[in-house]
Amino acid sequence: MSSDHKSKFDLELNPFERSFATKESSSVSLNELAAASNNDAISDVNSVATSGSSINNGSSSNKHNLHIPNISSVNQQQGVNGKLPGITPPLFTPGGRRLPPIGLSPGGTTSRQYSNSTNSGSLQSNTDTLGSNIWGGLPTNQTFQPQPQPQPQPQQQQQPQQQQQTQQPHNFNQFMSGMRKTGLTPNESNIRSGLTPGGLTNFGFGSNLVPGLSTPGALLNGPITPGLSSLLGITQTPSSLLVPTTSSFSQNNQSHLIQPAANTSVGPIPESTALGPHVNIPQANQLQQDQSSQALVGGLPPSQPQPQPQPVIAQQIHTIPENQSIAFDMTQPAVANAHLPESKPDLSETANLQRDLNPTADTTTNTTTATKKRKNDTAGGTNKKAKVAKGKKKEPKSKSKGKNNQEDDQNASNKPEDENVPGKENGNEENHKVEAESKEEHLQNGNETTTTKTNNTGNSSNGTTTTTTTKSKSKKNSNVSEDDKRKNFLERNRVAASKCRQRKKLLIQKMEEELEFYSNGYRELSAEVNELRGAILLLKEKHNIQDEIIDGLLSKPTTVPTNVTSIPSTIPTTLNPT
């Protein structure tokens, strides 16, 4: 590989670079391209490559071997000179036609749609040439290689479908690497600014056209990483991302796992389970066991035909070690949930009940009641065992605990006899010991076994009755307390209402007294105001009279005598004799 062998996109000139190019080199390259287009108009890609290599030996600047089909029409429009203008118009590239917008640009379309939309007028495209096959050859699975060396296609002896899947990601990966090396990807404005933002969904290389893109092999070997594929919206198959060791482990252990039998009986299934969502044990199996045991002991027919539950073998359950099961649950929770064995009740109790059957008709009723009460006791003991052994997990409480009973019965059958049990399980162990002793004595005397069972069940029934009485007393106390609370509430309301009425009466009486007081004061004040008003009017009248007198006195003229004689000052005289 030398510097001459470059990608076809490396040496292509954009309109801005074409404006600075010399007219001689551009005219020579255009003429040579026109001659090449006239000679090789209907030739294939190989003939175009050879003609391009011969042109590279000359002094032209067309080193990218791009065969442009519409060069003749451009030369005819340019005239006899064969010279390009200084700056090309925005609608035309140096080749004489607008490049199709790449699909990675926003709003871009495929080359086939663009070439179909531009095949009108003087701009005619030849689909057999290289210029259209660069953009249109990728979706149609035509060989496009940015390097002139022929790439060997792997595994041609296999099926054509597999060959197509390996060829298309190879071409697409080389195309993407070429696009990343060069910043010359044209968009709608003919500005080659590198990869513009957009998804692969707009490019036309979706999973329908290129099925190899959805496989992890093409993504890991190519320039696109799985993280980038998740960003670009390429969906991978989840089965390809699984750990091979855990999948093979699940396949090997499928033979050791027991599939659950179809549940044909109708019964309510509680929402709360003993082990969470990993083990799904239907409650109807416990109901089937109860009904079958009653039918075997008391000779009563079952309520409905029920399928025989399958016993669980202890070796099949313990095939998976603890460390492998933990790793298996960590890696594949879905597979672990699907293939965990579902525990089923044993038929040991039913077999023991068949041994304990008494042929005499007198003890059948006693045995039926004894077995019913004993099952209640064992159910209570197993519930305590589940709470002690699994104290770390907080299990939701429910009314029906059939699932817990079934799982604990199976665990008890699988455990050895010498295993240490907490203090809460002592009652359960004593019940089992008494049952074993009663079985041995039953072989000697059948009536004694029934009496021992009735004694044991009598003690348990006494415990249950005491619990029920305490519950009933608590309910009564709660009811009595609620009635007392209601009575106290009503009494408080009554006292508060009476006090409110008394305060209201006092306020009304006070308001009446104040009203009377203020009304009397108003009347007295109004009378005094009237008296003062009369006095004021009298004073006004007197004042008016005085004013009139003063005005009258002042209005009289002064008369002076004309014959005035000199009078001595010591003698008083009247000046104005009347």
Curated annotation (Swiss-Prot):
Cellular component GO terms, alphabetical: nucleus
GO MF term set: DNA-binding transcription factor activity, RNA polymerase II-specific; RNA polymerase II cis-regulatory region sequence-specific DNA binding
Keyword Cell membrane attributed: no
Domain bZIP, chain residue ranges per copy: 483-546
Keywords for this protein: DNA-binding, Nucleus, Phosphoprotein, Repressor, Stress response, Transcription, Transcription regulation
Residues covered by region (Disordered): 39-169, 176-195, 287-311, 342-489
Amino acid composition bias (Polar residues), ranges on this chain: 39-50, 70-80, 107-132, 184-193
UniProt-annotated stretches for the region Leucine-zipper: 508-515
Post-translational modification: Undergoes HOG1-dependent phosphorylation after osmotic stress.
Family annotation (PROSITE patterns): BZIP
Listed Basic residues bias regions: 384-402
Annotated region (Basic motif), positions in chain: 485-505
CDD domains hit by this protein: bZIP_ATF2
GO biological process: cellular response to copper ion; filamentous growth; filamentous growth of a population of unicellular organisms; negative regulation of filamentous growth of a population of unicellular organisms; negative regulation of transcription by RNA polymerase II; regulation of transcription by RNA polymerase II; stress-activated MAPK cascade
Family: Belongs to the bZIP family.
Reported function: Transcription repressor involved in cell wall damage response. Regulates 79 caspofungin-responsive genes, including several cell wall biogenesis genes such as CRH11, MNN2, and SKN1. Also controls the expression of pathogenesis and hyphal related genes and represses the yeast-to-hypha transition. Mediates the response to oxidative stress.
Name of this protein: Transcriptional regulator SKO1
